[in-house]
Amino acid sequence: MNQSVRALEYEAMLLWRHRDMRQPSARGDDRRLDRSAYILLSRLELAGPMSIGQLSEAFGVASSTVHRQSAAMLCAGLVERIPDPEGGIARKFRLTEEGRRRLDEERGRNVRGLERVLAGWSEEDTAAFAAYLRRFNAGMERLSAQGPPPA
C-alpha cells in the first residue's frame, strides 16, 4: 500500500466523505461508522483515553454534542468509560476492541477508496497533496479556534 495514501486518509476524512469512494459492504448490513464516530474514535486511538471535556475542547464543539455522540458509541460498544488513568475525577472514554475493529475496517475502506481516486498519481504528487491537505486542515482548525471574524 502506498504510505502517502495511508497518511492522507485521516486528513481527507476531515475534509470530505464522498459516497463514490466507499465500497458497499460485502455483508450488505452497512455497519459503517458515521463521520463523527470515525473522527472521535480516531482521536481516542491517537491520544488515548479522553474525557468529554477534553474531546469537546479538541474538536471545538459543545460538550452536549460530544455527550450525545459518546452515548451512542457507548451503546454500540465502540467505547467504554474508565476512571482517569492519571487519577483525575473525570471519567474518560477509551476504545473497546469492537471500536478498534470497526475503526480499522472503516479506515481500510477509506484507504481503498483513496487508492482508487488517486490511481495513476505519482508518489510525489500524492505526498504533495497530503501535505497541502494537512496544511489546509490546520488552517481551518486555526481559524475555528479564533472564532468568527469581526463584523
Language-model regions, residue ranges each:
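Short helix-coil-helix linker/hinge
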Residues: D30-A37, T96, S122-E123
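N-terminal leader segment of winged-helix/HTH proteins
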Residues: M1-S36
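Key DNA-contact positions within bacterial/archaeal DNA-binding proteins
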Residues: S64
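Charged, amphipathic alpha-helical coiled-coil/dimerization segments
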Residues: A71-A127, A131
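Terminal interaction helix/tail motif
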Residues: Q3-E11, E105-A151
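Pre-recognition alpha-helix immediately N-terminal to the DNA-recognition helix
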Residues: I39-E45, R101
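Short capping segments at the starts of secondary-structure elements
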Residues: A47-S51
